[in-house]
Amino acid sequence: EAPKAAEPAKAAEPAPAPAATPAADAKLPDATLEQRVFDLETYFNNVAPGVDGDKKWATKIAVAGPGHNAFLMICAALVLFMTLPGLFLFYGGLVRAKNVLSVVAQCFGLAGLVALLWWAFGYSLVFGKNFGGTFLGHIFGGSEYFFFAGVTSAPNTDYAYWLSQNVFAMYQLMFAIITPALIVGAIAERMKFSAVMLFMLGWMFLVYFPMAHAIWGITGDMNGVW
């Protein structure tokens, strides 16, 4: 008996496509004219767009992006220029010639010191919130952003829907830099560089971080008072 011819291999059947979920198929309706005006108001009041009670729609207003971030970066650069070179040129012109370099060094040194403190602890102590409800929460914000953990290009909606959190943190850093640098005018020609750095290290934790949190922090005791 003649051997049978081998049957051709069957093609593998394609795997069935996953069933679409209702949430994936759902599409928010386009915004009406009234809802677009509502979104514009949310933009100026820094609240979430596209939501009004139980109604939701596809907002036409962009979230954090290049335009908003670019404007804030320009603002941050201008604030930094107030310190470097603004303050050291101003204070340098008020002291004797032999102390000009001392004032310049103090301003530059403070900028570096505060930048490191802000990255490591400062931003979290001012704008964090996981200390809320505790005694420590009346003084500092929280520890969730230590070393900029979780500080990404996504907005921190406790403070701004339209800005990346890392850009917001950089902008706030500029104020943390210029504030202790203003004190240099009171101690010019009176303190050594090392003494200034040690004094400002303590001053940031004892004065600036608690006060900034109380006024600007989402859980600050004086937030919204003015």
Stretches found by the model and what they are:
Residues A2-W226:
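Hydrophobic alpha-helical transmembrane bundles of multi-pass membrane proteins
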